[in-house]
């Protein structure tokens, strides 16, 4: 069963309301995605903890329809410095 980029975006925004979220279906099959999640909730957290926050937001979708998810998780300040 596939999941849409819009559904992924909505789940992340529900858990991290301040987040700017961009999601791409990298294969067109609804199971491989790349996402950039920019949130102040990431301030003071390392990459693993940032990813855990996103995985928690996606819940059971990480064990089901999402097979692969490439994440970029900058804070707003880190994103502005790019």
Regions found by a protein language model. Give the residues of each.
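A short interface-forming secondary-structure element
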Residues: 34-49
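N-terminal first-folded block
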Residues: 1-30
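Short loop/turn motifs enriched for small/polar and acidic residues
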Residues: 26, 38, 72-76
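Short connector loops at helix/strand junctions that flank enzyme active sites
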Residues: 30-32, 37, 64-66
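Short, active-site-adjacent cap segments at secondary-structure transitions
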Residues: 29-31, 78-79
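C-terminal structural segments of small proteins and small subunits
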Residues: 51-82
């Amino acid at each position: 069963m596939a999941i849409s980029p819009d559904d992924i975006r909505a789940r992340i925004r529900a858990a991290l309301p301040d987040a700017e979220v961009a999601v791409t279906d990298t294969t067109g099959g609804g199971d491989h995605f790349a996402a950039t999640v920019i949130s102040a909730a990431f301030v003071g957290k390392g990459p693993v903890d940032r990813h855990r926050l996103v995985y928690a937001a996606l819940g059971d979708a990480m064990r089901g329809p999402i097979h692969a998810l490439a994440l970029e998780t900058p804070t707003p300040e880190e994103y502005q410095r790019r």
